[in-house]
Design a protein with these regions (language model features):
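Active-site-adjacent structural elements that line small-molecule/cofactor binding pockets in enzymes
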Residues: 1-296
């Protein structure tokens, strides 16, 4: 199993850079940030955006994989996203992973629109978003005429350091999203039970995870892909609780998640208060174990 850390972009860089550098020193396989203008409880608090954060993190680190969980149609057109992704991947020396999701409803998604998207429109936009972003990152010139997105002879020079493009980590819970992950994803991303914001013991997430993994594998078979070629990434966000209560809890959770089919286990950098309250000392103790032999 691979282990990752997600860092809330709330700190000024002189503080944040220490977390990103420490994540690499701790031995995590990948480190992630959020892609929002504001987010939930942080609406009236300090919040920095994903592109400059990842750019700075790319300069600050050397080995660790870097990514966003997740970019969505809420914030930017695929043409602008693709250009930023290519630049960050270059600065990072080919370490970027692009997380993509349909985007949550709420104030973050309506700041620049008069009316919110319907669920159907959001799903349609996400499908076009993934397909167009894929084309923009794979080929030097792209023309695309979709229902929601247009690209007219967009020149993508240079292409990504990683070929044929940066890996996609596609967040999905429904049938259409699972199919997108099966078609385009190097990773499939889940937070456990969809739309659950109340914390629950991590054991309670296992039945949902098993069902979701089964749905992903079915989608892979339907599109003619070997299910084993798609990594399964779990973000332990608000709904999956208790994983950093102790090192024992962390590795117990990792073992249970692995048995459910998860390959990548991402926890939140502990904060002094909710959300994601916890002790950095526990994370440090977990890190001490990461290089030791274990069953997971």
């Amino acid at each position: 199993m691979r282990f990752g850390i997600q860092i809330v972009p709330e700190d000024r860089w002189q503080t944040a850079r220490v977390k990103w550098r420490r994540a690499e020193q701790m031995g995590f396989d990948h480190a992630w940030t959020y892609d929002h203008l504001n987010w939930r409880a942080f609406r009236a608090k300090d919040w920095f955006t994903a592109v400059p954060t990842l750019t700075a993190a790319a300069v600050e680190t050397e080995r660790i994989g870097l990514g966003v969980l997740v970019a969505s149609p809420n914030l930017r057109h695929p043409v602008y996203l693709a250009k930023d992704v290519t630049a960050i991947d270059d600065i990072a020396g080919g370490r970027l992973i692009l997380g993509l999701g349909s985007g949550a409803e709420g104030f973050d998604s309506t700041m620049t629109r008069r009316t919110p998207w319907s669920r159907r429109e959001r799903t349609e936009r996400f499908e076009e978003y993934v397909r167009l972003t894929d084309l923009l990152l794979r080929q030097p010139v792209t023309t695309f005429d979709g229902r929601h997105y247009v690209a007219n002879e967009v020149h993508s020079y240079p292409l990504c350091q990683q070929q044929p493009r940066v890996p996609f980590a596609i967040a999905a819970a429904g049938i259409r999203g699972m199919r997108l992950a099966a078609e385009h994803g190097s990773y499939w991303v889940t937070t456990g039970e969809p739309n659950r914001l109340v914390s629950a013991p991590y054991e309670q997430a296992l039945p949902v995870l098993r069902q979701q993994v089964e749905a992903l594998e079915k989608a892979c078979v339907e599109v003619g892909r070997d299910p084993a070629t798609v990594a399964r990434l779990l973000i332990c966000g608000p709904s999956v609780g208790g994983v950093l209560e102790s090192p024992a809890a962390f590795f117990d959770a990792a073992g249970r998640f692995a048995e459910a089919g998860i390959t990548d286990f991402v926890v939140q950098w502990p904060r002094p208060c909710e959300p994601f309250s916890g002790k950095v000392e526990v994370l440090e103790k977990v890190a001490e174990e990461l290089d030791r032999p274990r069953n997971t």
